[in-house]
């Protein structure tokens, strides 16, 4: 094995409660009595659906379309283009998991470490800068114009980096996007199971945090 590809959010960087807090702020601004958790659950489903459509849209564009649709469904009056900024701002200043910097440093001495994330580029780079993280190769869905689990996402990265599927390990916390989809392409996978659920999706390895990769990979 020559390289390790990392998902970011939920894997290297915590999303915390930023998204649900943003929803609460949006609904409070509208003086709405809609249950924030239910509203957010619908938002996530719309977001995922748009990520899977044929026409590529950036996450920023998807967030706007999502909120416009939700405002229409719930009869909420207001400027969704203005209100969505609350959600977009929640994407910044997210915090790295504590074990990550040292683990990445150890892994990078033996393997090429590559970022492969379902996100727009600018917020991701801001989060890396905020946490003092530096990576040589960073791939985003915006740059690739494809979202996981589209095979194009993984295959373009492999092609540009000059690796075969057998030469890399993909590490992430999503069963479909980080385990099932890359596994179908012949890529080894590591599930980051921070909640220690013990779920099996056909992953090569299961870890509870990134530091556990080091002994597995001989670092």
Segments predicted by a language model, with ranges:
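N-terminal helical cap/lid subdomain that shapes the substrate entry/recognition surface
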Residues: 1-98
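Asp-based, Mg2+/Mn2+-dependent phosphohydrolase catalytic module
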Residues: 1-4, 32, 78, 101, ...
